[in-house]
Amino acid sequence: MDSSILSKLKYEPYSYSRCVKEYFITRDDNSDIKYFTSLIEIPTGNIGDNFLSFTDLNVFFYRLNSIDYYRSHKKFKICGAYITDLRSFKIKGVNDPTINFNSFSFPQFTEFNPLIRSRNDRLFVCVKFECELSELYTLNAFMINFEGNYCEIPKDMYNCLNFSNQLEYFEGYIEMNYSEPIEYEFIVRARSYYLDIFCEFCLYDINFYMMNNDSEIVESLNDVAVLEMEWENIDSRIDFKSFTEDNMLHLNTIEDVPMTNLPDVIPTDCFFSN
């Protein structure tokens, strides 16, 4: 990127926080839960037609009531944080436990090497942690806080900035291959869950289960769980059990995204592929 152009960008503080709604699961070779991942989407759709430039980014992960809770529970460990678009890149954060054990910085993004995204680019912050499932059930809500500096890039600078392939130069850059089907498993603790995170994905083999505190599946909910569309005049239920690899649920736009509706406030597993 042209440093003389980048030096003209005027930054201001940016902060966004949201409670975690779901816990994605990663299992080990024995199918036991290895760690959980929580994530939030950083809103970029309110910036008009401009591109947004981020620098000096930090991510904080904490329990709403007490950060000291983590220090008194040895079974809880925050393992890492990263920024991703869920499709093409994942960039790791750096943790300094001597300063703040539950925060991660992203030194890759500086004034002369910023993270630039358009309003149409989805951007997520993810935090990975280890925890007993039984403890996860007893915890209050978690919060992810995203902080940094941002700048709306003026339109007259668009053609002067070459940022189309910027991500391939960042230290810690990881290529994520989504050309093959990916299985997602996650737990939600709510009766309804809006699947907006999977906008622009194609889903199939969707299943709902009840789990106990030992992370054992004890009951299938496929006969009672439903997918519902509630946009404008649309009010319909989708037969999710019919979606297979040959007949996928295509979520091309936000209007295509359904909501799961469950009979009770229960944990749920969902297996998704794009």
From Swiss-Prot:
Superkingdom of the organism of origin: Viruses
Protein name: Uncharacterized protein L576
Native source species: Acanthamoeba polyphaga mimivirus (APMV)
Organismal lineage: Viruses, Varidnaviria, Bamfordvirae, Nucleocytoviricota, Megaviricetes
